[in-house]
Amino acid sequence: MSTPFYVSPEQLMKDKADYARKGIARGRAVVVLAHADGIAFVSENASRALHKISEIYDRVAFAAVGKYNEFENLRVAGVRYADVRGYSYDRSDVTARGLANAYAQTLGAIFTTESKPYEVELVVAEVGRRPETDQIYRLTYDGSVADEHGFVAMGGSADQISAKLRERWHAGLTLAEALRLAVEALGSDAAAEAAGTGPREIAPDHLEVAVLDRTRERRTFRRLSGPVLAGLLAGTG
């Protein structure tokens, strides 16, 4: 009788974590950063049909990297959660913190009990009435939650991009300044570092950009594209 194959729990969790991290690192990065009038979301994404950045509710938005079908399932579940909570209680009861907790439970359960973890990393953000009340939460494949302040980068080359943001970001940036910083940071990825040529130029039509705009009433989410985005990046918007 052969001896059953045994894998220790520690090794199993390590293998799952390595698998998820590799899947996430293959994707293009997303940058989320606060500015004077709200929160900006920027990703290098040429597709106009497959979004990495989406509205969840009035003042809450979602960004993700990794496997599209997995984070799309989470997005849809988040919209349903928000709709039910807003209808059952009050619209103001739908918060980024509550949604982040719900996602953390889902991701943690999948990572622990399923043979394959989700290859996703998420940001859930909520724009406040004042800059100091903005909330940005980062969730990883195992359900871990981090409360981020000011900015966050996730996906491929996240370390290099975060280093650029750390050097340049400060409170009170205008929207145009925040977008230009985000695009420059996205261009400062591992490929640009290896080539030694400085940040890559990323055309506006290869970007997916959205904002939570605190100056708007009720629904604060809006997408930026075309001449509006090009003008902001050129400093003329």
Swiss-Prot record:
Organism lineage string: Bacteria, Bacillati, Actinomycetota, Actinomycetes, Kineosporiales
Among PROSITE patterns, the record links this protein to: PROTEASOME_ALPHA_2
Q: Which family does it belong to?
A: Belongs to the peptidase T1A family.
Q: How is its activity regulated?
A: The formation of the proteasomal ATPase ARC-20S proteasome complex, likely via the docking of the C-termini of ARC into the intersubunit pockets in the alpha-rings, may trigger opening of the gate for substrate entry. Interconversion between the open-gate and close-gate conformations leads to a dynamic regulation of the 20S proteasome proteolysis activity.
**What does the function comment of this entry state?**
Component of the proteasome core, a large protease complex with broad specificity involved in protein degradation.
- InterPro entries xrefs: Ntn_hydrolases_N, Proteasome_alpha, Proteasome_alpha-type, Proteasome_asu_bac, Proteasome_sua/b
Q: Where in the cell is it found?
A: Cytoplasm
Its recorded name reads Proteasome subunit alpha
- Quaternary structure and partners: The 20S proteasome core is composed of 14 alpha and 14 beta subunits that assemble into four stacked heptameric rings, resulting in a barrel-shaped structure. The two inner rings, each composed of seven catalytic beta subunits, are sandwiched by two outer rings, each composed of seven alpha subunits. The catalytic chamber with the active sites is on the inside of the barrel. Has a gated structure, the ends of the cylinder being occluded by the N-termini of the alpha-subunits. Is capped by the proteasome-associated ATPase, ARC.
GO molecular function ontology, one term from the record = threonine-type endopeptidase activity
Q: Does the keyword Cytoplasm apply?
A: yes
Query: Might you name a Gene Ontology BP term for this protein?
Result: modification-dependent protein catabolic process
- The source's superkingdom equals Bacteria
Give yes or no: UniProt keyword Transmembrane. Answer: no
Alphabetical list of SUPFAM superfamilies matching this protein: N-terminal nucleophile aminohydrolases (Ntn hydrolases)
Q: Which UniProt keywords apply?
A: Cytoplasm, Proteasome
Cross-referenced HAMAP family, in alphabetical order?
Proteasome_A_B (MF_00289_B)
Q: Where does this chain mainly localize? A: cytoplasm
Pathway(s) this gene product operates in, as recorded in its UniProt entry: Protein degradation; proteasomal Pup-dependent pathway
What GO CC annotations are associated with the protein? Answer: cytoplasm; proteasome core complex, alpha-subunit complex
